[in-house]
Amino acid sequence: MENVFIYRYTVLGSKKISNLIFAIFIFLGSIFFLKASIFSFLDLKTNSLNGNIVFFPQGLVMGFYSLLGLLFTFYSLLTFFLKIGFGYNEFNKKENVIRIFRWGFPGKNRRIEACYSINDIKSIKISSNTGPKNISISLKGDIDIPFIREGFSDSFSNIEEQAIDIASFLGIPLVYNQ
């Protein structure tokens, strides 16, 4: 990595196939709940599991849950297709800059970009507290900027490997924060 001046990798954000599959399952469950709610309201009997559901309160609650599920499905599909959180982390030795870029929701601030000088970086920090593990850039002045979380990568070992690669590329220390 001595002759390489730019180290760049993409961050998937919400554009993962597991999010799409999860949204499809929530959609199917919501449709089943909506069907059960409508059939209980119209007092129709079916051969499925909802044979004896009274509209008030069970059918009404199932209708409410189905609407919540459909809204959640819409939100999940919207974040998937708009690539919310998708972006890249770029470490550029030639320009002496670290660039963190992500896509946000449509609007005035859809493009989220943060640039920092490599000279301002004190260390790369791996936090492994009880919550989700993450990598952050520790700037001079005790400012930590997280840029990779455990949920956005495959596993914690991949996060550690990326942190080691970044620290060795930049020539700065790697710190484990327990």
From Swiss-Prot:
The chain crosses the membrane at residues 21-41, 61-81. One of its GO terms (biological process) is photosynthesis. It is a multi-pass membrane protein. Keywords: Chloroplast, Membrane, Photosynthesis, Plastid, Thylakoid, Transmembrane, Transmembrane helix. Its main location: plastid. It comes from the Eukaryota. Disulfide bonds: none annotated. InterPro entries: PSI_Ycf4_assembly. GO terms for cellular component: chloroplast thylakoid membrane; photosystem I. The keyword Hydrolase does not apply. It is found in: Plastid, Chloroplast thylakoid membrane. Seems to be required for the assembly of the photosystem I complex. Belongs to the Ycf4 family. This is Photosystem I assembly protein Ycf4. It comes from Bigelowiella natans (Pedinomonas minutissima). The lineage of its organism: Eukaryota, Sar, Rhizaria, Cercozoa, Chlorarachniophyceae.
